[in-house]
Every structure is written in C-alpha cells, then in structure tokens.
Amino acid sequence: MLTTMKKSSLVLALFAIAATALVTITYALTKDQIAYQQQQQLLSVLNQVVPKEQHDNELYKACVLVKNKDALGSKQAMPIYLASLNGQHSGAAIEAIAPDGYSGNIKIIVGVDSDAMVTGVRVLSHQETPGLGDKIDIRITRWVDGFLGKTVENAEDKNWAVQKDGGQFDQFTGATITPRAVVKAVKRAVWFYKTHQEELQTLPLNCETK
C-alpha cells in the first residue's frame, strides 16, 4: 500500500512539474505578442483622444505617473501621456477614474490640447448597465463627443454638470448617475492638466516601471 501511495505521489509531483513547465513555456512564447497587442490597443486609443496632427512624438513612450486621488480618482499613480509637436508641448492624454459610477469605477482617458481644450474622451473600462449606463462607451453612442472643444474655466465651473444638475451635458433616460460620474471625472482631469501643465513637463518619464 505504501508503494502505491509513493507511486501516486510521484505521479502527482511529475504532473505538477509538467503543468508548471507548460504554463511557463506558454507565457514565454506569448508574452511578447500580448505586450505588442496591448501596445497597439493603447496607440489606437491615444490617437483617438489626441489627434495625429496635434503631435509628432511617440505618445506611449512620453508617459509620466501621477498620484493625485482628488484629481484622478485613484490612490494609485495614473499615467499621463505628454504630446509634443516640433519639440513643443502640445497637450496630453490623462487616464483617470470616475469612482462614483452606478456599478463601480469607470476608467477613462481624456485628451487635451495645450490650451486645455478637450480633444477626445474614451471610456477604457466600466461595469455600467447594458442599455442604460453603457451609452458612455463610444461603441454604443457618440455621447462622449459632447466634451470636444470644451475646457474648464475654474474649479467651480457649473457648466460641467449634466443638464439635470444645471449643466450643459446630456444625461441618459433612466441613467443619470453614470453620465454625472463621467462628467465630473473629465472635469477634474481637465482642470488638473490646466493647473499643472508646466509641472507635468518636468516629471521623469517613468511609466515603464509601472
């Protein structure tokens, strides 16, 4: 009986070793492809929120990490991609979190030019209700295009609210919480950029260590 148990243990051990080796080999073979796909997805989003004619640098490489929960909605450092054109700063793409979505965090990226005018907004991830709150997704509706060309005049700019709250942005029928959360998050991101633009340009490019 002991011999049988030893054999079973040996078989299990060999199986575990083989499984671990398979996972390791699979990861080694696919990690470069996964990294490439992630980079291409990032490039696509960056070019959607910061137009190509606005920059001539490699945005994904010109990245700084900024930790500011009040402005960017997260305790974790968030990436900000700095655009430049002909060697001059020309805007940024700012990742931020709207922590008060109906179903939890909504991750967004906000593009701005050097005058802090919005050049694009995209929702990177969310868990909002299909058919209601998911209208923030560009694949569902063009609602986020309502931010284009707008800026924040001051920290108390009352235009930056949904119409139900006296602001300029549409809400959704039966789903006010979601657009309200996104509007507030975009406002905070734009105001942060507007008031920290020069400081951002002095930070070290450090997103590769994220």
UniProtKB/Swiss-Prot annotation:
It is a single-pass membrane protein. Its cofactor is FMN. The modification FMN phosphoryl threonine is found at T176. The gene is rnfG. The lineage of its organism: Bacteria, Pseudomonadati, Pseudomonadota, Gammaproteobacteria, Vibrionales. SMART domains: FMN_bind. One of its GO terms (biological process) is electron transport chain. Pfam families: FMN_bind. Its main location: membrane. This is Ion-translocating oxidoreductase complex subunit G. InterPro entries: FMN-bd, Ion_transpt_RnfG/RsxG. GO terms for molecular function: electron transfer activity; FMN binding. One of its GO terms (cellular component) is plasma membrane. It is an enzyme of class 7 (translocase). It is found in: Cell inner membrane.
